[in-house]
Amino acid sequence: KIMDKIPFDILENEIINKGKPFLGICVGMQVLADKGFEFGEHSGFGWIGGVVNKIISEDLPSIHIGWNDIEIKKESPLLNGLETIKDFYFVHSYVFDVESEDSIVAQTNYGNNFSSVIAKDNIYGVQFHPEKSQKAGQLIFKNFMDT
């Protein structure tokens, strides 16, 4: 279990109490949830309310692999400069069903809409892989470093 392998109390103190910026990528975004169901039911960090569930689509494979656009729902420093570049690389079979619409920054459609960028205070999560997303991904990292 991931929770058994990290000094969670130290991490939580730095992120929640001291306000250090945190960026979760792919599964790193998913662990921000209250719980997830990949390989059984597991607790997450609970920093952004919601649950991680398997992708359900009648017409598409249950694993989302490849390039897809994000639809920006609200402004966020993480997405500064991305008005014209919104294509990112995804590899996942689970999605974060976010509890509060206020935490959804962008969504993506893969059979159904899912949260692809989330944020709450100093905590950010992206379902895609910025490290594989060329210029758009570089901009995400730059924006995060500038927060």
Question: Which stretches of residues belong to each language-model region?
Answer:
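Amide-donor transfer/coupling interface in amidating biosynthetic enzymes
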Residues: D4, E12-N17, V51-T147
